[in-house]
Amino acid sequence: MAAYLLAVAILFCIQGWPSGTVQGEVRPFMEVYQRSVCQPRETLVSILEEYPDKISKIFRPSCVAVLRCGGCCSDESLTCTSVGERTVELQVMQVTPKTLSSKIKVMKFREHTACECRPRSGSRVNIGKHKRSPEEGEREPSSPLTPGSL
């Protein structure tokens, strides 16, 4: 077993880590950015959270992988929101503890097909110019980010 683990470790060193980059290699900005934007991405969802009325059953697996919106938006007042959905049907094993019976069951899950950054519920987003009262005064323009300012 130890020889197997050593061989796997050596293979990772030669071929690179599973993420696609060699350990210690810097991932390019555009790859980092593209992977972080608001988009449908594989997410593990608990079956019992999707079907709370089935609490008396046991499911295997207990969670399933579906596409759900996730990622970063350009502004704190925005959140990554689904704007398109479809229904997918997945096979899972349902176990009934009382009778110790099990069967393969097809269950439906929502999967997101398109995402957008939209205002958070309850957030006040100003569209256009906001007129300030004399008590508020003028606001100083924010300074742009420079490479050394972070």
UniProtKB/Swiss-Prot annotation:
Record bears the keyword Ribosomal protein = no
Record-listed Pyrrolidone carboxylic acid (Glu) modification sites: 25
Task: List, alphabetically, the GO terms of the cellular component aspect.
Answer: extracellular space; membrane
- Location of the protein in the cell: Secreted
Which PROSITE patterns does the entry link to?
Answer: PDGF_1 (PS00249), PDGF_2 (PS50278)
Tell me the domain of life: Eukaryota
Is Disulfide bond given among the entry's keywords? yes
Q: Which GO terms describe its molecular function?
A: chemoattractant activity; growth factor activity; toxin activity; vascular endothelial growth factor receptor binding
Classification via SUPFAM superfamilies: Cystine-knot cytokines
The protein's name is Snake venom vascular endothelial growth factor toxin barietin
